[in-house]
């Protein structure tokens, strides 16, 4: 099968799966508050549990995909996603909510494998565009998923879980019957096999070796900080709409849909145009500046329209920054270590998504609703400084 067809199929698979994930985004905080009667800090823990499991399983799945192939790992993860969503539909306690997020977290650990799949079927020249497809799948999942979730919440929260599971099962079937395996049979297969055999399921030494490379380390660090800054507001964004702006689940769904649509447009095509008129250094500097400013403005937007405008600009910033950094990470990594490196990066990103919601929920409840967003802005300022003064010294960006 042609590489273009493979890209289309992996895009559809990730999109359909993330559509199910997106359905729960606007309703999880309100479900937790209205049905389970838990506070903001507990909501942060529930969100963090999902990411903590991803932190543990991302490198494991990355290494397994290097050895056994991308397709079987993706198939298993999609099935586990469906199971997690079904458990959510029957949730009547906080412990059940945590359990459902843990199962879904294992299933959601396949994104690093999907990124490795993209790396397998693209050249270094068009890899940034390929990575943008994953971002576009995220964006479209965030467009339609939250909209569907907000609308379905009118019929009960259980329905949203069943529909989310249905989407994951569609992606499951699509992957089994149509998605080709992307992992190549290298001429130096012995070397690859040795690399795999040397790695334990959670090989700290392999991670140290990868992060010891200065160019790779700074890229992973930048991605980590950005992910923390964004995860900081992941759960609190819907809480802000619910408790401060007085949004309904449907309005929260619309807001997440606006964010996702912008991200999909940027990563699905606009980033390619932007990449032709400016170099990567300029793209990263402008993006980090926009993210920093808009995060600081979110709690003070005042109205639905004001928040929508700020969110659109924020989505443009993240939509250009993330795939560019992912592309650079892939470019400075050898072919035999694409899976483990991207899996490691995804794992560290998951750890940032553990810390972010924990801090965001705590800050929202005990310090005040602006603080999760202001914290994100402060950390993004660090990204801005590193992008301007440090990153160009380590990596060729022109």
Briefly describe each language-model feature range.
Residues 2, 180-220:
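Juxtamembrane intracellular "pre-TM" segments in multi-pass secondary transporters
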Residues 134-177:
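Helix-loop-helix hairpin linking two adjacent transmembrane segments in secondary transporters
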Residues 55-95:
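Conserved MFS/SLC helix-loop-helix module at the cytosolic interface between two early adjacent transmembrane helices
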Residues 279-325:
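C-terminal transmembrane helical hairpin of 12-TM major facilitator-type secondary transporters
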Residues 100-140:
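Cytoplasmic helix-loop-helix junction between adjacent transmembrane helices
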Residues 58-69, 266-279, 364:
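Helix-to-loop junctions at the C-terminal end of transmembrane segments
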Residues 26-40, 235-251:
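Short amphipathic helix-loop junctions that connect adjacent transmembrane helices
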